[in-house]
């Protein structure tokens, strides 16, 4: 089964920005209700896109530098990053099919 990647301030450059695959990064926090609702969806997406895209989660409380760098104000916010650049952004606990559609636009 696919597992989402735990993104951090330390590994963001090498694992996310330098990745040759499209990366979905879910910015979340443990105190955020909608983030918790989105959690299982992110895990399902990690399964669905195993080998095709990287699905990552970044805890904004533990990794304030990256969250600040991308101006993340409300969570959950999801960024799709490809070739080191943000190519898409979604805010809120969206349904899985909407998120998947966005990822699909940036794969391949």
UniProtKB/Swiss-Prot annotation:
<dbReference type="InterPro" id="IPR013766">
    <property type="entry name" value="Thioredoxin_domain"/>
</dbReference>
<dbReference type="GO" id="GO:0015035">
    <property type="term" value="F:protein-disulfide reductase activity"/>
</dbReference>
<dbReference type="InterPro" id="IPR017937">
    <property type="entry name" value="Thioredoxin_CS"/>
</dbReference>
<protein>
    <recommendedName>
        <fullName>Thioredoxin</fullName>
    </recommendedName>
</protein>
<keyword id="KW-0813">Transport</keyword>
<keyword id="KW-0676">Redox-active center</keyword>
<keyword id="KW-0249">Electron transport</keyword>
<keyword id="KW-1015">Disulfide bond</keyword>
<dbReference type="InterPro" id="IPR005746">
    <property type="entry name" value="Thioredoxin"/>
</dbReference>
<feature type="disulfide bond" description="Redox-active">
    <location>
        <begin position="32"/>
        <end position="35"/>
    </location>
</feature>
<dbReference type="InterPro" id="IPR036249">
    <property type="entry name" value="Thioredoxin-like_sf"/>
</dbReference>
<dbReference type="GO" id="GO:0005829">
    <property type="term" value="C:cytosol"/>
</dbReference>
<feature type="domain" description="Thioredoxin">
    <location>
        <begin position="2"/>
        <end position="108"/>
    </location>
</feature>
<comment type="similarity">
    <text>Belongs to the thioredoxin family.</text>
</comment>
<dbReference type="GO" id="GO:0045454">
    <property type="term" value="P:cell redox homeostasis"/>
</dbReference>
<dbReference type="Pfam" id="PF00085">
    <property type="entry name" value="Thioredoxin"/>
</dbReference>
<comment type="function">
    <text>Participates in various redox reactions through the reversible oxidation of its active center dithiol to a disulfide and catalyzes dithiol-disulfide exchange reactions.</text>
</comment>
């Amino acid at each position: 089964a696919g597992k989402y990647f735990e993104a951090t301030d330390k590994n963001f450059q090498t694992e996310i920005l330098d990745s040759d695959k499209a990366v979905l990064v879910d910015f979340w926090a443990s105190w955020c209700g909608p983030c918790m609702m989105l959690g299982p969806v992110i895990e399902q997406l990690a399964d669905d896109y195993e080998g095709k895209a990287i699905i990552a989660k970044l805890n904004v409380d533990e990794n304030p530098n990256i969250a600040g760098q991308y101006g993340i104000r409300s969570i959950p916010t999801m960024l799709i990053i490809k070739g080191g650049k943000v190519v898409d952004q979604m805010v809120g606990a969206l349904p899985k099919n909407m998120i998947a559609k966005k990822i699909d636009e940036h794969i391949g």
